[in-house]
Amino acid sequence: MSTQDRVNLRVTHHFSAVPERVFDAWLDPEKTKKFLFTTPTGQMVRVEIDARAGGKFRITDRRDGEDVDHVGEYLEIDRPRRLVFTFTVPKYSTASTMVTIEIVPKGSGCVLTLTHEGVLPEWADATKGGWAGILAALAAEL
């Protein structure tokens, strides 16, 4: 499948927390394990984050007795405005995609816009729903 066949997704969420708190949660393993790629029946078994441009991450959730890795590399870290990373879930696809998180202050909180580029069409609905759930879980943790 060519990259032309892929889709881009966008999810927006309003947070009552300040941009710095929202941004920092994405790079803090203790916070990340509570909201990122967690599932209701899963168990977080590993969170490795090298929070620098060129650094890598690996987040592993155990689902129904099977480990599911979420891996990527940080391409840009501009606290508290922008975070860009590659993203792959090897169990489901070897295709690498790109995620951009942009955070803009709004009132006493902020608005986060997450753009996921290069998603396979058959995964678009599940991926968009997954990101919406992740952002809601992040809001609950903050």
Predicted regions, residues:
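Intrinsic-disorder/low-complexity, polar/charged segments enriched in Ser/Thr/Lys/Arg/Asp/Glu/Gln
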Residues: 6-12, 44, 56, 69, ...
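Beta-strand/loop substructures that line and gate deep hydrophobic ligand-binding cavities in soluble
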Residues: 84-133, 138
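Structural motif
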Residues: 5, 16, 77-79, 106
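Hydrophobic ligand-binding cavity/cleft-lining segments
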Residues: 1-42
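Glycine-rich portal/gate segments that line the openings of hydrophobic small-molecule binding cavities
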Residues: 43-86
